[in-house]
UniProtKB/Swiss-Prot annotation:
This protein binds specifically to 23S rRNA; its binding is stimulated by other ribosomal proteins, e.g. L4, L17, and L20. It is important during the early stages of 50S assembly. It makes multiple contacts with different domains of the 23S rRNA in the assembled 50S subunit and ribosome. The globular domain of the protein is located near the polypeptide exit tunnel on the outside of the subunit, while an extended beta-hairpin is found that lines the wall of the exit tunnel in the center of the 70S ribosome. Keywords: Ribonucleoprotein, Ribosomal protein, RNA-binding, rRNA-binding. Belongs to the universal ribosomal protein uL22 family. This is Large ribosomal subunit protein uL22. Gene3D superfamilies: Ribosomal protein L22/L17 (3.90.470.10).
């Protein structure tokens, strides 16, 4: 069995307290972007969840640098995948003895950064 030279690193953030639709807005924004540019965009993004995405991206960059020895100046965000996690169900009392269910959604985030060759 031949071992391939790995040129990508991953990081994940699980059970983030935000809906997957809102998280995917930020994740889709940084897909196929250089890591340095993505970090700047996430720093100044008005979205609340951008801070969590930035932390996960910084973790992926640290994994690439420390575990694989990749050059951080040539890293590109190749995958930013969002998945649904658990749903916390709550009950809100309403008028006339009724009750309404409130769903609080959680999401998972997976980020992959790859070292691109200079062309």
């Amino acid at each position: 069995m031949v071992q391939e030279n790995k040129n990508f690193a991953t990081a994940q953030a699980k059970s983030i307290r935000v809906s997957s639709r809102k998280l995917n807005l930020v994740a889709a924004f940084i897909r196929n972007m250089k890591v340095s540019e993505a970090l700047v965009q996430l720093t100044f993004s008005p979205k609340r969840i951008a801070k969590v995405v930035k932390d996960c991206l910084q973790s992926a960059v640290a994994n690439a640098e420390n575990n694989l020895g990749l050059d951080i100046d040539r890293l590109v965000v190749t995958k930013a995948t969002v998945g649904k996690a658990l749903v916390m169900k709550r009950v809100m009392p309403r008028a006339k003895g009724r009750a309404t269910r409130i769903n609080k959604f959680f999401s998972n985030l997976y980020i992959t950064v790859t070292e691109k060759e200079d062309n």
